[in-house]
Amino acid sequence: MIPTSDITGLILAGGRGSRMGGVDKGLQTFRGAPMAMHTLMRLSPQVGHMLINANRNLAAYESFGVPVVADSVPDFAGPLAGILAGLEQCQTRYLLTAPCDSPFVPTDLAAKLSQAMEEANARIAMPVTMEPDAQGQPRRQVQPVFCLIDALLADDLIVYLQGGGRKIETWTARHATVDVLFDDSTAFANINTLEELHQLAERR
């Protein structure tokens, strides 16, 4: 398994929050603390170093005690721009990402992804969960914003973004990628509206 010291964790908090009315999702209070702080507390014990990707309210994120990196690609280019910012700044061979609005990040995320990456000789590892479709039948759901990435792929990601690419799964398909099954799909629940925020706080 990849040593913890070889992995940098990256919290993706650089989006517009448009589905939540433009608010900064990572700074919304969830059970008494900002959502991004919940993600930080669950992710940081799994890695050797931490970064936060943010494009506004930088001082608020810096108060978490973790280096903050902004997108180098302009105009809120999506999560891949945040991932690139992390790849450009991390000093380790691997980068582990998680969005700021996922307060139940699995505590074994790094361990399971790194083990699968090594066993498959892959460059990227992503979680997969089984979730019901419209007919109630189980289907595979890839969780692409939670991923372990070989930092040597940074140059290829630059090329992809410069060519106008924005979809995570389209970029990861260019490389050897392994999917890793996780049983608890709610661990990857992200929060896109204030209503979902309140519902999740009450439910779990």
Swiss-Prot record:
Catalytic activities: Mo-molybdopterin + GTP + H(+) = Mo-molybdopterin guanine dinucleotide + diphosphate
Annotated Gene Ontology cellular component terms: cytoplasm
Annotated GTP binding sites: L12, A13, G14, K25, N53, D71, D101
Broad class of the protein's primary localization: cytoplasm
Enzyme class: transferase
Transmembrane spans: none
This protein's UniProt keywords: Cytoplasm, GTP-binding, Magnesium, Metal-binding, Molybdenum cofactor biosynthesis, Nucleotide-binding, Transferase
Gene Ontology annotations of biological process type: bis(molybdopterin guanine dinucleotide)molybdenum biosynthetic process
HAMAP family per UniProt: MobA
Sample GO molecular function, one term: GTP binding
Family: Belongs to the MobA family.
Protein name in UniProt: Molybdenum cofactor guanylyltransferase
InterPro entries: MobA-like_NTP_Trfase, Molybde_CF_guanTrfase, Nucleotide-diphossugar_trans
Subunit structure: Monomer.
Residue sites binding Mg(2+) per the record: D101
Cited function: Transfers a GMP moiety from GTP to Mo-molybdopterin (Mo-MPT) cofactor (Moco or molybdenum cofactor) to form Mo-molybdopterin guanine dinucleotide (Mo-MGD) cofactor.
Enzyme Commission number(s): 2.7.7.77
Cofactors that this protein relies on: Mg(2+)
Domain notes: The N-terminal domain determines nucleotide recognition and specific binding, while the C-terminal domain determines the specific binding to the target protein.
Lineage: Bacteria, Pseudomonadati, Pseudomonadota, Betaproteobacteria, Burkholderiales
Gene: mobA
Compartments reported by the entry: Cytoplasm
